[in-house]
Amino acid sequence: MFSSVAHLARANPFNTPHLQLVHDGLGDFRSRPPGPTGQPRRPRNLAAAAVEEYSCEFGSAKYYALCGFGGVLSCGLTHTAVVPLDLVKCRMQVDPQKYKGIFNGFSVTLKEDGVRGLAKGWAPTFLGYSMQGLCKFGFYEVFKVLYSNMLGEENTYLWRTSLYLAASASAEFFADIALAPMEAAKVRIQTQPGYANTLRDAAPKMYKEEGLKAFYKGVAPLWMRQIPYTMMKFACFERTVEALYKFVVPKPRSECSKPEQLVVTFVAGYIAGVFCAIVSHPADSVVSVLNKEKGSSASLVLKRLGFKGVWKGLFARIIMIGTLTALQWFIYDSVKVYFRLPRPPPPEMPESLKKKLGLTQ
């Protein structure tokens, strides 16, 4: 599979100009016409520089594997770091009478459980979101290449927002299957006092009570929450980066240093995160209540909460998701920089399309 994807990636519109030089300029140089001295012509220095600049080809198995590793770090570490805020948010959703607001929620939790109580659920959070990040970012890169090659260069540019939405939705579908068991255990630990304090205690107890259903009954609401969230996260980020370089950053991306590019990544990530929190919050409320209660269904929970109830805890979630999304993109892009992975610039209109639209002579 990866070999076919790598082959498609070579001509992909999201590929970098440097990598195109690698593919076009570093073929079998013995087949090149001989030079004036009769020796085979050597590849251009520019292509050689591109080989030294990147650690792997765009679209190779190594590229996708390292993108997945970047997803593990970006999602696993950030979600674990905000466990206290997530815990209070979940408790506000399932028991709004007791936890009346974000500050009151922290106060009540500290009073009843102490400082250690704020870390409840850290293990399933780390494991679950690490697996989710692996699938989310790794498969996004795969689907982006596959879908863009199905569309062709010109349509990829014209319909790039739709492509981002489709690729991210496809990736998140699989990512949520990996996340669901750990998310169910996390919510039980955080919202049911006395049920279990650790993943080791919660998982066997859940299986004994409800079987495998206990771990996957929340997967459909997870799709409801995470797929819109991820579609917004990737599409909004990609287009915000494009807009920042076009209208805000005073110089082209190619002239920006790596730290400057990472600042743009962080800002675009935070903007995307605010929108992510808003579109996914109602489903997040349903997931929190559903995983707390035995024998309940998403439709019953949604009916009971009502329109006002599903928006409880939104402010806390905007703070959490905005910061979270910005840090995730920053970490993910930093991993690409560290491992010297290809980082294509924002897409530009193909020359063939410019000619069709009469934008060039």
From Swiss-Prot:
It is a multi-pass membrane protein. It catalyses: phosphate(in) + H(+)(in) = phosphate(out) + H(+)(out). Pfam families: Mito_carr (PF00153). PROSITE patterns: SOLCAR. The chain crosses the membrane at residues 63-85, 121-140, 161-182, 218-237, 261-283, 314-332. Solcar repeats lie at residues 62-146, 159-243, 260-338. GO terms for molecular function: phosphate transmembrane transporter activity; phosphate:proton symporter activity. Residues 25-44 are annotated as: Disordered. Keywords: Acetylation, Membrane, Methylation, Mitochondrion, Mitochondrion inner membrane, Phosphoprotein, Repeat, Symport, Transit peptide, Transmembrane, Transmembrane helix, Transport. Residues 1-49 form a transit peptide. Coiled coil: none annotated. One of its GO terms (biological process) is mitochondrial phosphate ion transmembrane transport. It comes from the Eukaryota. It is found in: Mitochondrion inner membrane. Residues 86-120, 183-217, 284-313 are mitochondrial matrix. GO terms for cellular component: mitochondrial inner membrane. Residues 50-62, 141-160, 238-260, 333-361 are mitochondrial intermembrane. Inorganic ion transporter that transports phosphate or copper ions across the mitochondrial inner membrane into the matrix compartment. Mediates proton-coupled symport of phosphate ions necessary for mitochondrial oxidative phosphorylation of ADP to ATP. Transports copper ions probably in the form of anionic copper(I) complexes to maintain mitochondrial matrix copper pool and to supply copper for cytochrome C oxidase complex assembly. May also play a role in regulation of the mitochondrial permeability transition pore (mPTP). Interacts with PPIF; the interaction is impaired by CsA. Belongs to the mitochondrial carrier (TC 2.A.29) family. This is Solute carrier family 25 member 3. It comes from Pongo abelii (Sumatran orangutan). The gene is SLC25A3.
